[in-house]
């Protein structure tokens, strides 16, 4: 007598390792504008949120000693006017890279063809631009992530100068929404 026996079976096993945690970072950027300045140094002493609907920045006329004047700004060839200083702060836990673009112009936008803008970031001069050339006045600026209670920030100064070659066709014109 012959006896044959077989067993047919599938064996499975699982091995796994748990990943502790995957968590995304938080990007938290604030944009503020200067509202008050030290009368001796001219440095900003107070800031307001620039992202609020009622926050509209206006160019500021300064005298020869860089003192701010409250008069209306009427552009004329050769004159330079400044925006209030802007402060970009990184309150998040991710590093940040940003640029500042001049855009949104409405009205007689050809007026921007004869205004050259320039900027500085923390005192370092950036490239001067004309809006018709693309409008990115500040590019590739980096801010580290917030560490403890200290939020890294940059102070940006932007000015515009009307070209001395601007002719009569630019008189009594308005551009808004920049």
Regions found by a protein language model. Give the residues of each.
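Long, small/polar-residue-biased beta-strand-and-loop interaction regions
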Residues: 1-178
